[in-house]
Amino acid sequence: MIKEQNYRVWLLAFLYAGIYVFLIPWVDIIGKEFEDTANYLFRIIYLQEGGTEAHYSGIKWLLDEPVWRFIILALGETFNDYRLSLYFISFIGMLLYGSFFFRRVEFYVVMILLLNPMSVNLFIEQVRITLAFGLLLFAYDLSSKYLKIVIALIAFMIHASMPIFIGIYFILYYYNSRVEARKYYLITVGIALGMALFMKFGLNAILTAVGDRHAGYGDIAGGSSIAYSIVWFMIASIIAIFANFENDEERIFAGYAIVFMSFFFFGSIFGIYGQRYVAVIMPIIIIAIGYLPPHIKQGTYLFMFSYSLLMFKYWFELTLI
């Protein structure tokens, strides 16, 4: 029975990822190239034509994301169509997301994830963080602790932000059995505020000190509007107040969703680009909404679906300007 269920999960994930990545012409729909895609294409072409990049050792080597460098080189050597090679990475990332997602939610709920501009940007454009976090989701469902550690290390060497996602999980895991629900959710909001303050005032100084190329990125990227982020903070509040749990995993997932949705809100106040973090953990947010009482759950799903369609309208209008 378990093997049959796993087979169905991977089949659904395969079909979902294939349709989303290869059959929907996202670039034609929005009428312009994705910025990160253009940067990846330029890097592949540059390296294939004999271009060179700096090489590091020690901590700088880890922070330089060596596995992603290897993947970029491998894509250039393996594929003649470099854009197709990036779509292949999108497909793998979505497949890993799907293997996690379809074990925990009804099929129709996937449409909420699908019809969301943030998800399009994540899966089609920001393929590096999609692949890295997808590996973490895949590792979560493995039984072997050794494999979990190895895969987490690989994910870190694809995208250096992965320790943030891992660290938040273990903080929530630590407090889960030590505090009651009300304090637990106050802690999640406190973690989110602490993250925003750290990324605003501390992270850039650390990255500059170690000579990391990501130093100053937050200032360049800028923040999202408070009006946009407050919607996600409202959803976080609904989960914190009304969610019911059957086990520790569900409580931790809910806390995880609350942390990053709250961080998005606080980040918008401080001018930090927090939208991407919500996009990355979108499956966990949707799973956490599933812990709400039926009438609140359905209403929240409907609200998210409607809000996503509205954001698509706004997104398309911006791309046409």
Task: Please place each PLM-identified region on the residue numbering.
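Signature aromatic-anchored transmembrane alpha helix within multi-pass, membrane-resident enzymes
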Residues: 182-191, 297-314
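Start-transfer (signal-anchor) and selected internal transmembrane alpha helices
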Residues: 1-22
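Alpha-helical transmembrane segments and terminal signal-anchor/GPI-anchor hydrophobic tails
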Residues: 7, 22-56, 65, 69, ...
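Membrane-embedded helix bundles of polyisoprenyl
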Residues: 108-126, 130
